[in-house]
Amino acid sequence: MSVSGLKAELKFLASIFDKNHERFRIVSWKLDELHCQFLVPPPAPPLLTLHCNITESYPSSSPIWFVDSDDPNLTSVLERLEDSKNNNSLRQQLKWLICELCRLYNLPKHLDVEMLDQPLPTGQNGTTEEVTSEEEEEEEMAEDIEDLDHYEMKEEEPINGRKSEDEGIEKENLAILEKIRKSQRQDHLNGAVSGSVQASDRLMKELRDIYRSQSYKTGIYSVELINDSLYDWHVKLQKVDPDSPLHSDLQILKEKEGIEYILLNFSFKDNFPFDPPFVRVVLPVLSGGYVLGGGALCMELLTKQGWSSAYSIESVIMQINATLVKGKARVQFGANKNQYNLARAQQSYNSIVQIHEKNGWYTPPKEDG
């Protein structure tokens, strides 16, 4: 679809479900993203926030939806939408989603969803898209794909003044994002696409959010893609609670080995964000801190049972940082460094998950954090 065609479709949707709609609101939109709200009755929270990522290959590939909620019923709705490949159209997906949410909260079907079956009005919001020949259309689409980022930069900001998705990101990190985009396009052209569109788009969003984050910019942690893979990250925890024994250990480690961080490996599967990343400690060897054999982490957050597709990767990183300190993690100086490896970490992780699935997870008293 051409940029002007996608823009017309988004404006059409926003004209139906504006920011004052009684049931479903499109709060803001860009060519690659929708920010929406669904209004639900008490006792549920009054506003349910949903996000939709629109891929460059839309409508050949389906938009990706996720929700800011831990409710498994909501996750189930989005998983069913993801599993349904019958229609990639934003309009039809939006209709299905609104109807399912109304059904979930025992609300009557809203009449406005029927408007989504209508064809796009000619010249919607001043947009005219006359195609005089197939050749012209193909030429336009090729230019749109090549220069998509430039069109996005020129796109009118929504009413709420939302800034460019690259706002607040340093030049060196923008270069990394651009390198990934080019690599993905080349892989697509070569028919050698790795991962899934859903996971790749979400991981790109997570990476952009991290690059904008103050925690990242102030050096609490850093992120590096392994072999430029969007699905394999090295995360360095560079700052922990200065009053913790772990902080003191890291100072000693710096003097002895020149290492002043905890290195984590995050690996993501094709079905991310519906499944959690697999996270393990690479170095140094730690005791305590809920670190298992091989470097795996004993955290319900990192299991299917405790995971939510709404969780951001930065929140996971910060939670791991806090959990290591809370669990009184200590550096094991002189330990065999080869004891931490992927195979052993996966084995430890699978064993602990089976135990907790059978016996449940321990929830510490509130005074313990």
Curated annotation (Swiss-Prot):
Keyword flag Disulfide bond: no
Record flagged with keyword Nucleotide-binding: yes
One GO BP: protein K48-linked ubiquitination
Pathway this chain belongs to: Protein modification; protein ubiquitination
Annotated CDD domains: UBCc_UBE2Q
Active site: residue positions: C298
GO cellular component: cytoplasm
Tissue: Detected at embryo implantation sites in the luminal epithelium of pregnant endometrium. Detected at low levels in ovary and liver.
Induction: Up-regulated in pregnant endometrium during implantation.
Main enzyme class: transferase
Region (Disordered): 117-143
PANTHER family registered for this protein in UniProt: UBIQUITIN-CONJUGATING ENZYME E2
Function: Accepts ubiquitin from the E1 complex and catalyzes its covalent attachment to other proteins. In vitro catalyzes 'Lys-48'-linked polyubiquitination.
Listed name of the protein: Ubiquitin-conjugating enzyme E2 Q2
Gene, per the UniProt record: UBE2Q2
